[in-house]
Amino acid sequence: MQCALYDAGRCRSCQWIVQPIRDQLSAKTADLKGLLADFSVEQWCAPVSGPEQAFRNKAKMVVSGSVEKPLLGMLHRDGTPEDLSDCPLYPDTFAPVFATLKPFIARAGLTPYNVARKRGELKYILLTESQFDGGMMLRFVLRSETKLAQLRAALPWLQAQLPQLKVITANIQPVHMAIMEGETEIFLTEQQALAERFNDVPLWIRPQSFFQTNPVVASHLYATARDWVRQLPVHHMWDLFCGVGGFGLHCATPEMTLTGIEIAPEAIACAKQSAAELGLTNLHFQALDSTQFATGQGEVPELVLVNPPRRGIGKALCDYLSQMAPEYIIYSSCNAQTMAKDIANLPGYRIERVQLFDMFPHTAHYEVLTLLTKTR
């Protein structure tokens, strides 16, 4: 991938960009095999990759500069702003949105937040696009509600220019820290969720729900999990750390009972909406802590699927799963290091299958799907 920002030394986020994708995949595979070297792996599946550029469905832009000439991008370590509107990781559909947002910020009088001075209102612009219908969700992350009336008043102009903006919100983040969003979300449109669809499975994206940023590879990841589950004699499963329900909704069948657990209520609202659309009445999604839910149960299903954050599932959940011993565990991880540590705490299981998914090209990061089977 060619990137003028990288070539000019203005951005180094894609640290592996000079390596061909083939070499990147080889390095990631070697890293994963090194982390799992202490375990016997029955089957290594071929890694899955997607497009090298224009693959992201989400942009997280720091707003800097002045209200008349805002910059959308990032701040370097020394506080110097960098405009990343032309980043080649974003699809072509993002450029006209960024170009329109800059004069809109001036129209609405949304002064960019100045980190050094602790002054200003607009901290971030968060933009998400649906691959299903091209609809977009735009979130203005503000320091306070001071400029909310001005934002509302100027909004009709923006919506006329960019009718693809289906969901628009103001998120209030009052803390002087590099935190992307606050707890308060104020909807500025009637529509509150973005429709998405992977592999003919309806999914929904709400403002404070996690959603994978690489739709092509994520679609392969969910489809692979579905295929693995269909090969197992499973009638009841848990989907822990389930997010908007991507794994569970793909794996579920009308005959299967599935419980999905996720701590974020916004994500659970999305999962419930999808389950209702699919007409699957044996799917139950609850907004709870996954570890607390699991360890509070007196019995487990045949299959437990986990998709934890980077920290992994942790020793308490590993100990519980070891004790209760479900027949199968499917572990989806964005941090193979913590996954390997967790697997070491599951001594009663063998690794039947592993597959790497290159969700984050040009970086050292990747996603991995692992099937663990109870040793007889």
From Swiss-Prot:
Active-site annotation: C334
Signal sequence extent: none
Binding site for [4Fe-4S] cluster: C3, C11, C14, C87
Domain of life according to the entry: Bacteria
E.C. no: 2.1.1.189
Cited InterPro entries: 23SrRNA_MeTrfase_RlmC (IPR011825), MeTrfase_TrmA_AS (IPR030390), MeTrfase_TrmA_CS (IPR030391), SAM-dependent_MTases_sf (IPR029063), U5_MeTrfase_fam (IPR010280)
A biological process term (GO) from this entry: rRNA base methylation
Top enzyme category: transferase
Entry keyword set: 4Fe-4S, Iron, Iron-sulfur, Metal-binding, Methyltransferase, rRNA processing, S-adenosyl-L-methionine, Transferase
GO molecular function: 4 iron, 4 sulfur cluster binding; iron ion binding; rRNA (uridine-C5-)-methyltransferase activity
Residues that hold S-adenosyl-L-methionine according to the record: Q212, F241, E262, N307
Catalysed reactions, as listed in the record: uridine(747) in 23S rRNA + S-adenosyl-L-methionine = 5-methyluridine(747) in 23S rRNA + S-adenosyl-L-homocysteine + H(+)
Stored Gene3D superfamilies: 2.40.50.1070, Vaccinia Virus protein VP39
Family statement drawn from the similarity comment of this UniProt entry: Belongs to the class I-like SAM-binding methyltransferase superfamily. RNA M5U methyltransferase family. RlmC subfamily.
Function comment: Catalyzes the formation of 5-methyl-uridine at position 747 (m5U747) in 23S rRNA.
PANTHER family associated with the record: RNA M5U METHYLTRANSFERASE, TRNA (URACIL(54)-C(5))-METHYLTRANSFERASE
Protein name stated in the entry: 23S rRNA (uracil(747)-C(5))-methyltransferase RlmC
Lineage of source species: Bacteria, Pseudomonadati, Pseudomonadota, Gammaproteobacteria, Enterobacterales
Gene: rlmC
